[in-house]
């Protein structure tokens, strides 16, 4: 296929048009008074969003070179979203500003490579300054609520729910977002370890009203094999029956004679017992059984470790304060495991998370970590219509990611103030030539842009407010929601440090690539000739 090759100013101008087209659509969403964007979907109703990356992902331009520019900035938004989970609009605004200022200087004869070196030096200095400005969130529920509220577009109800969820499950816990059946948005917390396997027979139910099995202080037998013969279980069932405590059997499966005998004994009242299948599959099943063993202070009966069911003693069994089983899930609360063993297992899983490259494996390891270290909270998002539901769910997801980022790296003053304060760190930065110094000045100017855009979206004059905020010190900034100057941190207008840092790093990285582009090669689309009309296709004259 033939190619279209464009060089120099023509190529860069078209790339800039693409950057501007995407950035202008995204940046209307920035700040407390940012507007919504409505996206047409190929199926279903339209999607209404204030999420920068959702807008960016929808944009495809007709001109291939302009489209390349748009795709490069789309990469900024997507990468920021992947790493920090929020800050996509800020990253897009920064990228547009660096490209705009940079291309002006390239057109005026500056060396693009030196401009890029200057930009990179400036970004490094700003990131170090952001780290100095950063404050730890610690266990402060109020700070978590503020971060979540701002990221959910100043929705305090969502902020409150997320802070409750974090309070219950801790920073290692898993918080998932589901669609609610009604219009209420609620949080549901599962204490202890829950896995998605229910009782193997409804005859094990102890509470027939709720159709659940409830055990207090049960013994827990863990095995990685199928149990089909009763003689394997007899040696352990006798001492358990004498102790008067219930028994939960977690194995690959209890079947045949063994299951029938357990059910009969349960119905007669001779034994309080229930059997559930082990969670997961293959190697993951073995790992999860080991997790349960560590949590409950038991031992997995496995031929791999040389232990057999018929040799099982009471000391091999785990214990827990309470176990609840329904037809789909089993929950173990307050296992009897040693704290030191659980901590070393948690550290082992954390190390595996660091090493793994697969997103799926990472997600599964994260779930295991949560079940061991904290718990699981589910946020049920309710709304009156499906369109509102999707929009709200997006905001809750953003808020959740932002909160995790804040817990991880701390917080800085929000509303674009932290970036404005970081400008001073660029004064007197050592450079090798004038063009590198110009690169630093480009970043200085660009750091004001998020604040300028927040103010513009609120209908105010950006330059005046940027100048006044720049004159101030520390956390002094502009609250665009109320139109007042305030201390941003004490007013709860805060951003996660990680989000601000990642937004700037990604914006500078992609902008640098774009500024140093000298040639663009695209495909020339052939015009497909129209299909010739078949004779008599109008059926005219036919009887």
UniProtKB/Swiss-Prot annotation:
CDD domains: GroEL
Residues annotated to bind ATP: 29-32, 50, 86-90, 415, 495
Sequence intervals crossing the membrane: none
Keyword check for RNA-binding: no
UniProt-listed Pfam families: Cpn60_TCP1
Catalytic activity reported: ATP + H2O + a folded polypeptide = ADP + phosphate + an unfolded polypeptide
Listed EC numbers: 5.6.1.7
InterPro entries the UniProt entry points to: Chaperonin_Cpn60_CS (IPR018370), Cpn60/GroEL (IPR001844), Cpn60/GroEL/TCP-1 (IPR002423), GroEL-like_apical_dom_sf (IPR027409), GROEL-like_equatorial_sf (IPR027413), TCP-1-like_intermed_sf (IPR027410)
Protein's cellular compartments: Cytoplasm
Record's keyword annotation contains NADP: no
Keyword terms of this UniProt record: ATP-binding, Chaperone, Cytoplasm, Isomerase, Nucleotide-binding
GO cellular component entries: cytoplasm
Gene Ontology terms: biological process: protein refolding
Cross-referenced Gene3D superfamilies: GroEL (3.50.7.10), GroEL-like equatorial domain (1.10.560.10), TCP-1-like chaperonin intermediate domain (3.30.260.10)
Enzyme class: isomerase
Listed GO MF terms: ATP binding; ATP-dependent protein folding chaperone; isomerase activity; unfolded protein binding
Function: Together with its co-chaperonin GroES, plays an essential role in assisting protein folding. The GroEL-GroES system forms a nano-cage that allows encapsulation of the non-native substrate proteins and provides a physical environment optimized to promote and accelerate protein folding.
UniProt record similarity statement: Belongs to the chaperonin (HSP60) family.
Known partners and oligomeric status: Forms a cylinder of 14 subunits composed of two heptameric rings stacked back-to-back. Interacts with the co-chaperonin GroES.
Protein's UniProt name: Chaperonin GroEL
Protein's organism: Karelsulcia muelleri (strain GWSS) (Sulcia muelleri)
The organism's taxonomic lineage, starting at the top: Bacteria, Pseudomonadati, Bacteroidota, Flavobacteriia, Flavobacteriales
Gene name of the encoded protein: groEL
């Amino acid at each position: 296929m033939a190619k279209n090759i464009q060089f120099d100013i023509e190529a860069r101008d078209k790339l800039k048009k693409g950057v501007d087209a995407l950035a202008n659509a995204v940046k209307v969403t920035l700040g407390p008074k940012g507007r919504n964007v409505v996206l047409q979907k190929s199926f279903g109703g339209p999607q209404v969003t204030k999420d920068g990356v959702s807008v960016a992902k929808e944009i495809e331009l007709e001109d291939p070179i302009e489209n390349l520019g748009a795709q490069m900035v789309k990469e900024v938004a997507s990468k920021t979203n992947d790493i920090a989970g929020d800050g996509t609009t800020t990253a897009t605004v920064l990228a547009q500003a660096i490209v705009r200022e940079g291309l002006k200087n390239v057109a005026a004869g500056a060396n693009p490579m030196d401009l890029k070196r200057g930009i990179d030096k400036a970004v490094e200095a700003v990131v170090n300054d952001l780290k100095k400005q950063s404050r730890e969130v610690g266990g402060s529920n109020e700070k978590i609520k503020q971060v979540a509220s701002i990221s959910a577009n100043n929705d305090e109800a969502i902020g409150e729910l997320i802070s409750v969820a974090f309070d219950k499950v801790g920073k290692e816990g898993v918080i998932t977002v589901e669609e609610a059946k009604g219009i209420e948005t609620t949080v549901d917390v599962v204490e202890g370890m829950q896995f998605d396997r229910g009782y193997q027979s409804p005859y094990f139910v102890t509470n027939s009203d709720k159709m659940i099995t409830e055990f207090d202080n049960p013994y827990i037998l863990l095995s990685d094999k199928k149990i089909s013969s009763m003689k394997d279980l007899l040696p352990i069932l006798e001492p358990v029956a004498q102790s008067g405590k219930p028994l939960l059997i977690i194995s690959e499966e209890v079947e045949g004679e063994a299951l029938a005998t357990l059910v009969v004994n349960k119905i007669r009242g001779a034994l309080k017992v229930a059997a559930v299948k082990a969670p997961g599959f293959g190697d993951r099943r073995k790992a999860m059984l080991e997790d349960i063993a560590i949590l409950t202070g038991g031992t997995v009966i496995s031929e791999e470790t040389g232990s057999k069911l018929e040799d099982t003693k009471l000391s091999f069994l785990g214990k827990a304060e309470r176990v609840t089983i329904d037809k789909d899930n089993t929950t173990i609360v307050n296992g009897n495991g040693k704290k030191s063993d659980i901590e070393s297992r948690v550290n082992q899983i954390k190390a595996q998370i660091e090493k793994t490259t697969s997103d799926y494996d990472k997600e599964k390891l994260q779930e295991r970590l949560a079940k061991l270290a904290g718990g699981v909270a589910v946020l049920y998002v309710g709304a009156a219509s499906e369109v509102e539901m999707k929009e709200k769910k997006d905001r809750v997801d953003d808020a959740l990611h932002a909160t995790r980022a804040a817990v991880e790296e701390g917080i800085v003053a929000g509303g674009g103030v932290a970036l404005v304060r970081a400008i001073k760190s660029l004064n007197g930065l050592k450079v090798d030539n004038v063009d590198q110094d110009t690169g630093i000045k480009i970043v200085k100017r660009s750091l004001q842009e998020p604040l300028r855009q927040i103010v513009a979206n609120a209908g105010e004059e950006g330059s005046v407010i940027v100048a006044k905020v720049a004159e101030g010190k520390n956390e002094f900034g502009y609250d665009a929601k109320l139109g007042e100057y305030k201390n941003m941190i004490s007013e709860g207008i805060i951003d996660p440090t990680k989000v601000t840092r990642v937004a700037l790093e990604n914006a500078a990285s992609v902008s640098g690539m774009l500024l140093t582009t000298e040639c663009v090669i695209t495909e020339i689309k052939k015009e497909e000739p129209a299909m010739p009309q078949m004779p008599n296709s109008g059926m005219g004259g036919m009887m």
